[in-house]
UniProtKB/Swiss-Prot annotation:
Main subcellular location: nucleus
Composition skew (Low complexity), residue ranges: 204-238, 254-286
Source organism phylogeny: Eukaryota, Metazoa, Ecdysozoa, Arthropoda, Hexapoda
Gene source species: Drosophila melanogaster
GO annotation (BP), single: border follicle cell migration
Gene coding for it: ab
Role, per record: Expression is vital for development; may be involved in transcriptional regulation. In embryos, muscle specific expression is required for segmental nerve b (SNb) motoneuron target recognition within ventral longitudinal muscles. Has a role in establishing and maintaining embryonic muscle attachments, adult sensory cell formation (macrochaetae) and morphogenesis of adult appendages (legs, antenna aristae and male external genitalia).
Mapped zinc finger ranges (C2H2-type): 544-567, 573-596
Biased composition (Polar residues): 1-15, 239-253, 452-461, 876-886
Keyword Disulfide bond: no
Domain (BTB): residue spans on this chain: 103-168
Name recorded for this polypeptide: Protein abrupt
Amino acid sequence: MTESTQLQTAENNNAGVVKMEPPPPATSSVSVSAAAAAHALSSLSSLTMAATGSALSPATPPPSLNLSHQQQQHQQHYALKWNDFQSSILSSFRHLRDEEDFVDVTLACDERSFTAHKVVLSACSPYFRRLLKANPCEHPIVILRDVRCDDVENLLSFMYNGEVNVSHEQLPDFLKTAHLLQIRGLADVNGGYPYSKALSAALSHNSSNNNNNNSSSNNSLSNNNNNNNNNAESSNHNKISSYLSPNQTSAACNNSSNSNSNNHSSSHNNSSSNNISGSLNSSLNSPFSAPQIPPPVTASSAAAAAAAAASLTAAVAAAAAATAASAGSSSSAASGQTSGTPAIQELKASSAASPVRNPNPNPSKASSSNHWDMGEMEGSRKSHLTPPPQKRIKSADLFRAQHGISPERLLLDREFPVAGQHPLTRNRSGRDTSKDRERNLELRESLLGQALENSNGQQANPKHELGQSAGEDSNSSDTEPSDRGDGQHDGTLDGIDNQRSHSFPNAFLGLQGIPGLLPGPSGINSDFVSRRSLEMRVRATDPRPCPKCGKIYRSAHTLRTHLEDKHTVCPGYRCVLCGTVAKSRNSLHSHMSRQHRGISTKDLPVLPMPSAFDPELASRLLAKAGVKISPAELRARASPTGGSGSSGGGGGGGSSQAKLDLSNASGGPMDDAEDSDDDPEDLTTGNGLYGMGGSSSDLSRYHESLLSNFGHARMRNEAAAVAATAAALGQPKDLGVQLPNSNAPGQSLLDTYLQFITENTFGMGMSQEQAAAAALRAKMAQLNAMGHSLDNLPPGLLPGQFDLSKLAAGNPAFGQSGPGLTIEPIMRHEQAAGNLSPNRPLALNSGGRMMGHDEMAENDGDMRREGSEPMDLGLDNNQSGSNHEVANSDAEENYSEDEGVHNT
């Protein structure tokens, strides 16, 4: 240790206690090493020997004396004191904040953010301490709404430095924010801590000493002040002790002790009375306790302080009595309930605090008749362990007392209100987070307190309330009228009263949404809110019409899909796996999910048109999915690019061109048929099908296009399928037979067969009309197998384009070169034992008549003899199954779905 250290030796009777202190000049740091401690011990031993005046030589000490000396060394303690410890620690925290080292919390407000340390915020504010303990995050972000960034910056400077300079205009806002955030030194937050009782006891003890010993000093201050004035000053000192900030309280305590220790000189008594009068003025002119420069004390100022305290007492008593009378309770009960409750006056942020009006013209009588003793003040402090919320007013305290709401419960289960937020804004946030029961409890107290306070004033107009409620409904409007006030009433108590009076109907609107607030329906806004909510629910489920074509859709999502598919000019998108072109992104997704099941398409690239089909890329993507197809095979299977005679045409080109040029019976283009019937989300389909407004040609076109859906889409709803079949055949909707359900005999086999027709139409040389007719006859065969007599149809009932005999005669590939069309809804004998006989016809030949089992077996042998090869699904049996979910590559190439997929 390089610095000189002064050793002060103080020996007691039993053992010497050495106190080692640094010299009076403040040093930056003190470090004690092992060598320095040993040197100090040796010096101490020599100093101790010299101090005791021992004449023994250190070289030859007696054994007994040496032993006792060692015991004394073991019993000695060293007091190492760092004089500038507090300043060094505080400067270290300031340096850490300036360098942003080890910061672990962020305060965000007004588009700015400030970093700080949790330990500093927790030490300076019980609010932040509870908040950070309740949210144990590594680096939380605290969002302070409706708080100015200048106030937060000044508060952080105050917490790290202990002082801050604030302009006079910003002082009310700054003090209000400090009060809401419970910053120590700027707000009275000591009520809930253990040392508050000791502090109150010390203040009462010092004040009693001042009462007994300050008569001469008070006489020197003013000859007009008698013993009653001294007692009044002592009483005022007790009254304002609970309103003083920690700095003021400690200052008053220190001044009182100094006056007692220095023979109660007049100068110290002046400073003590100075503090009392300054604190009293501070408590009268501002709702917050803040350190202020005390004004010079004169006899008139002391008398004015006593008169002001008396007038404040009278004002509180009169206001409490008036509020109790308006609430329906007796004045005596109100006085007993509010005697221990101090008035809490709140001012909005303004440039200057307004003076308190004195309703009592004779303050001396009020002073003599209304005194706050120490017991009442102690009871008041016990009942207010936490600082009041933003808009907690005297009538809210009365409501709490009348309804038995305990403040201790608020302390234990308190939720943290957002700093600087208006109570009606907190009303909305409380409705949004209705699970926070204590926030709702605090909100109920605040709103009902405002209602009780405004009940003595002018009665609101019910029509005016209803008009404001129409614009205040927060459940149905995103742009709500602001009820924070426009600043026109800032700075005066009259302005606050007017603002609360105007916002009273709006405040009551929020009471309806809080559960448990009122015992029954309030009647103010319940009918309107329920009716408005019902209307909103109806509107939320209303169908949405298309602005282009007038079709009605169930949701906004289906309407957007329809607009993109039908009414948006898009070049189209090409399937990267098979080259099929879809006219919209939704159609491409539909094609992927139907034609490439089992292959994850979320990572596949989207190729907008014009984009060429890349077989190599498709082969690599299929290989990743476990499907091995060579690029050459994919190139050979790729569909031609339309009917312009491009390369890769051939027989496949003819079928593709036939599909693209397919038109309906009415001669309209294919897109018209798609627009009229292919949208499953269109709610106007039923009206168009069975309504009275459609023409016969439109109805016929709808029936025919619906029948064509049998050829390229499997209908899972069997009742809808039979109804569509009956409509196509001109029969009534109710066929008079029992519709087959999904558990009918052979239903799964029939579904598989219909899907096979769908996916292999062009591979078998069939047109779309032929596939639709085959699907229709298969459905009729299933009905016949179930015992329904639908096999004998009247002549001319079936449309000509669906007559299989005419179709076979007009298509040589279908009639002669190809095998006979046999539709066999094969069923297990155990399933159809009750409805099927061995000789019952089950199938249709190409001529349209029913075939027996012998003919079916013969045709089956003919098909085998002609060597009809099965379709290659191209998936290496990875996805084959009983339901044949995946089609072959030819069907993928030439797939045309109802949502606009086509080939180029």
